[in-house]
Amino acid sequence: MSPSRFAEITSRYPQLRIAVVGDFCLDRYLEIDPARAEVSIETGLPVHNVTRVRSQPGAAGTIVNNLVALGVGEIVPVGFCGEDGEGWELRRALRGLRGVTLEHFIQTTERSTFTYTKPLIVECDAIPRELNRLDIKNWTPTPAPLRARLADHVRALATAVDAIVVMDQVSIDETGVVTAPVLAMLGEIAAENPGLPILADSRRGLRDFPAVTFKMNANELATLTGAVSADPAAAAAGLARERMKPVIVTLAERGVLGALPSGETVSVPVLPVRGEIDVVGAGDAVTANAAAALAVGASLGEALVIANAAASIVIHQLGTTGTASVAEIGRILN
């Protein structure tokens, strides 16, 4: 991609309005100094002393973080949090992000705030080491009135945004934001607005999703299509033809692959790796960057070149779920 074409695409990002529909969580990092370790007088067990606490939006919030880093003009989260301390922290973190508006983000006593608490051993000149994670999640189905409210919020944004990103993060069916009513509404919107980019990613798989652009990894592609082969391009092309929507597949060390309903495929090789890496957040960087580029009219191939470069930046950011700015991506590509 030429520098002028990259500039042409990314210069339009400030005019975009993108909705992010899905499971927002609080990523809370507890930085532990091992030099301050103690032993509990009461129990005799080791005590980890936390010297710093930092939080940021995670899951669907990671998509938001990436869109903010790209300079997207307005980002509209559609989701929920609880009436709890974690929910207060999550809303504060989202409000503090440039361009994020919360009129479609619901706070409710009927749900707990989805939370990842990540203890990190932090030593001077060493890579942070994560201990066992502590999660807070919802184990019961999302109440029907809340599901209906969320679907209504999605409907309200259908003709008011330039793209929709759907992030289904929860592992238990119907306990999060992306429930049957929301999926049905997304299907209606996709049918009524064929030119609107709608990108979807799901931890539980995309089998029950309507005809929108699918983003997945190679294992998820194999599970969905039943095509366990060394040629993911053929499987992706078949899926794109069947669904009549583009398909995006991340291939780890092999880069990223895209397929169009015509059967045409594009493959973008991975960029060189420099030192230690952490792949957490790389897939979300691909999703966010592809959505922004497609929303301003980039081709699928152009969108994936940008998205692949963003992922190559994010994997080098250790001890956090990283992002990539337009300037950083431009330096990688040029």
Regions found by a protein language model. Give the residues of each.
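Conserved phosphate/ATP/ADP-binding segment of small-molecule kinases
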Residues: 171-265, 269
